[in-house]
Amino acid sequence: METARLLFVHAHPDDETLTTGATIAHYVARGAQVHVITCTLGEEGEVIGDEWAQLAVDRADQLGGYRIGELTAALAELGVDRPRFLGGAGRWRDSGMDGTPARQQQRFVDGDFAEQTATLAAAIDELRPHVVVTYDPNGGYGHPDHIHAHRVTTAAVAASTWQVPKLYWTVTSSSALAAALASMGAVPEEWIRVSADDLPLFGYSDEAIDAALDLTAHESARVAALRAHRTQVSVSPDGRSFALSNNVALPVDPTEYYVLAAGSAGARDERGWETDLLSGLSVG
């Protein structure tokens, strides 16, 4: 049987772990060929703590290069041998959130869309993935680079010579997030507890979700990968929750959720969900 191949397209270092980390580890453990393409170096990220604060964009502006090392370490924890960057490391700069001033380097959202699409399409033709994973049209939570990564990936899948059998969006389950936030255990005292009502941009209904992967067996790998992104992510001592620079406490969910954007679904369970992104494909 042909070896399964999966490609994950993400906007910044750490996104691969935050949204699809356990999925990546799962398919690597199954013997699949897994590649991660990151579109920027995450130069505009907010730095947690004082140790690496001088790397930030308003100081030395060296964060992007440092985050290559973080990404490399995180991918190693997930079983991926090396990072890949769209157009090469540093080709397009992190765009920052809405309102972030443009820098000298061309931002990802301002780049030549045709060039970006052709570059990713060439990678798809090289890697020939059976499954491609990226964000939904809102980029998960509205970040301009996530939205742009969705658009570029969608266009590249359509433009590539290789016919990708299945395209998925990584999404959050509204019901699972609400339950996990409500039942979350002790967190560091400086973290901020919120409810699902405080996170209006997050979440899909159960009816809108197509796949849910129970990845409990790979949560330790995901937590180790989260810890590798130390300038961006703080992880609780017990590994059950994490926070970004805003100190909002979020659960480490053992299940990762997906919407099938293109292709045919395989077998579904009693909830109407696939439990394997490779379901319906003749690959191992």
From Swiss-Prot:
* Gene Ontology MF terms: N-acetylglucosaminylinositol deacetylase activity; zinc ion binding
The Gene Ontology biological process annotation of the record reads:
mycothiol biosynthetic process
- EC number(s) of the enzyme? 3.5.1.103
Name the catalysed reactions: 1D-myo-inositol 2-acetamido-2-deoxy-alpha-D-glucopyranoside + H2O = 1D-myo-inositol 2-amino-2-deoxy-alpha-D-glucopyranoside + acetate
Cofactor (UniProt): Zn(2+)
Which SUPFAM superfamilies did the record assign? LmbE-like
Residues at which Zn(2+) binds: H12, D15, H146
Q: Does the entry annotate any disulfide bonds, and if so which pairs?
A: none
Signal peptide residues are none
The record describes how the cofactor is bound as: Binds 1 zinc ion per subunit.
Function field:
Catalyzes the deacetylation of 1D-myo-inositol 2-acetamido-2-deoxy-alpha-D-glucopyranoside (GlcNAc-Ins) in the mycothiol biosynthesis pathway.
Q: What is this protein called?
A: 1D-myo-inositol 2-acetamido-2-deoxy-alpha-D-glucopyranoside deacetylase
